[in-house]
C-alpha cells in the first residue's frame, strides 16, 4: 500500500464542563486529527497530545511539527507501507510516541477498511461490548463532587475514578464511600502529584477498599513505586510510566505495578498497546483502557482495544456525552453500563463532515 498523503487537522471541541486534574483544568479539547489517503482508500487517526506539555512531554504544536517535517515524509518515501511497518519506518526518530501512534492508527484504519476488517477483529476482540467507568475531575467542594458522582451512577457507569492531589484525597474518597457505599467500584488517579515521602498520607486511603491508586509518583520513578507498593495496601496502577511493552515488563519485574492502564497513544499506537496487553496477561497483571478525552474516532479504537481478554477492569471508555455535547462522529451511547464494540470496517465510525468542519481551526495537506 502506497501512502498518497496525509491531511492534518487542528480541531477545538468545547467540553460540557471544565475537567480539572492535578496538572490543570481543561474547558476545551484541542487536538490533532489525521486523514491518511492511499489508492485503496483512507483512514483516520487521532493524536492524543494536549495543548501544553503537562500530562506528557508531547504537545500539539510539537506533534504537528514532527508529523509534518519528519514522520509523514518518512512514510511518503516508502514504496509499500502497512500498519505493522510504521513503527520500524519511524524508529530512527526518537520519542514522539503519541504522534507516531496517531499516524499508525490512520494507516491501520485505511488498511482495515480496504480489507473490510474491523479494529476489534484485528486486535483480537473476545466481546461485543465493554463495561465503562468514568473519570471525575477535582471539584471545588465535596457536595459538588457527590452530586456529580451520583449523576454518573444514575447514568449507569459501573466504576468511578476520582482525580486526586495533595489536599484533595482522603476526604473526597471518604465522602464518596459514606454516601454511595462499599459496593461502588472506586479508584483514584494522582497523575504523578505525590512523592514517596507522601506514603503515610496515601496509606490513609487503604481502609476504603479502592480498586487501585493510579500513577501516584513521577513517571520515571519506577523504583519509588516499587517501594510505595511495600508501604501501602491499595494496589498500584501505572499510567504515565508505561510507555512500551518493555517498560511494562520491567515494572512488573521490579514489583512496581499490580495493574496497568493502557493508553494506546502513550505507548505509540494500538499494535504496541496489544503487546502491552499480552505482556501483562502473561504475568497475570490485569489491565484497563485509559482515556485522553478522545473524539469518537479515538473512542471507537479504544473500545475495540478494551474488548481484548485481559481487559478485566472497566476503563475510561465513557460515552460521548461525558465530555462533548456534540461529537464529530455518531455518538457512543451508554447502555446498561456498557458501550458496543464497533463491528464495521476499520474504526467502524467516521467523522460527520459538517460536524468536523465546525470544530476545525486549521488543516494542511502533506503529500503529492
Swiss-Prot record:
Its EC number is 5.1.1.-, 4.2.1.113. It comes from the Bacteria. Binds 1 divalent metal cation per subunit. Enhanced by the addition of divalent metal ions such as Co(2+), Mn(2+) and Fe(2+). Changing residue 323 to Y: Shows up to 6-fold higher activity than the wild-type on a range of N-acetylated amino acids. The active site is at residues 163, 263. Keywords: Isomerase, Lyase, Magnesium, Metal-binding. Mg(2+) binds at residues 189, 214, 239. Variants with increased racemase activity could be used on an industrial scale for the production of enantiomerically pure alpha-amino acids. The keyword Transport does not apply. It comes from Amycolatopsis sp. This is N-succinylamino acid racemase. 2-succinylbenzoate binds at residues 135, 161-163, 191, 293. Optimum pH is 7.5.
Amino acid at each position: 500500500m502506497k501512502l498518497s498523503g496525509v491531511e492534518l487537522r487542528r480541531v477545538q471541541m468545547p467540553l460540557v464542563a471544565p475537567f480539572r486534574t492535578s496538572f490543570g483544568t481543561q474547558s476545551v479539547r484541542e487536538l490533532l486529527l489525521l486523514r491518511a489517503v492511499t489508492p485503496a482508500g483512507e483512514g483516520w487517526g487521532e493524536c492524543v497530545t494536549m495543548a501544553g506539555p503537562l500530562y506528557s512531554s508531547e504537545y500539539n504544536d510539537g506533534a504537528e511539527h514532527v508529523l509534518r517535517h519528519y514522520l509523514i515524509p518518512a512514510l511518503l518515501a516508502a514504496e509499500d507501507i502497512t500498519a505493522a511497518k510504521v513503527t520500524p519506518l519511524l524508529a530512527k526518530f526518537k520519542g514522539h510516541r503519541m504522534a507516531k501512534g496517531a499516524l499508525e492508527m490512520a494507516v491501520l484504519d485505511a488498511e482495515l477498511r480496504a480489507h473490510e476488517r474491523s479494529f476489534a477483529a484485528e486486535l483480537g476482540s473476545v466481546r461485543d461490548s465493554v463495561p465503562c467507568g468514568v473519570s471525575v475531575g477535582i471539584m471545588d467542594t465535596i457536595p459538588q463532587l457527590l452530586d456529580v458522582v451520583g449523576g454518573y451512577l444514575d447514568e449507569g457507569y459501573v466504576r468511578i475514578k476520582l482525580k486526586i492531589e495533595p489536599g484533595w484525597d482522603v476526604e473526597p474518597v471518604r465522602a464518596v464511600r459514606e454516601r454511595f457505599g462499599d459496593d461502588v467500584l472506586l479508584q483514584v488517579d494522582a497523575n504523578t502529584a505525590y512523592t514517596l515521602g507522601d506514603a503515610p498520607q496515601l496509606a490513609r486511603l487503604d481502609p476504603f477498599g479502592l480498586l487501585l491508586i493510579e500513577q501516584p509518583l513521577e513517571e520515571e520513578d519506577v523504583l519509588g513505586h516499587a517501594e510505595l507498593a511495600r508501604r501501602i495496601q491499595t494496589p498500584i496502577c501505572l499510567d504515565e510510566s508505561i510507555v512500551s511493552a518493555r517498560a511494562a515488563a520491567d515494572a512488573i519485574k521490579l514489583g512496581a505495578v499490580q495493574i496497568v492502564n493502557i493508553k494506546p497513544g502513550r505507548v505509540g499506537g494500538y499494535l504496541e498497546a496489544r503487546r502491552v496487553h499480552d505482556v501483562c496477561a502473561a504475568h497475570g497483571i490485569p489491565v484497563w483502557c485509559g482515556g485522553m478525552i478522545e473524539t469518537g474516532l479515538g473512542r471507537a479504537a479504544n473500545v475495540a482495544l478494551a474488548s481484548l481478554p485481559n481487559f478485566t477492569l472497566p476503563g475510561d471508555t465513557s460515552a460521548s456525552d461525558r465530555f462533548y455535547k456534540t461529537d464529530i462522529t455518531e455518538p457512543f451511547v451508554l447502555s446498561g453500563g456498557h458501550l458496543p464494540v464497533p463491528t464495521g470496517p476499520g474504526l467502524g465510525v467516521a467523522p460527520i463532515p459538517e460536524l468536523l468542519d465546525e470544530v476545525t481551526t486549521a488543516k494542511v495537506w502533506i503529500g503529492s
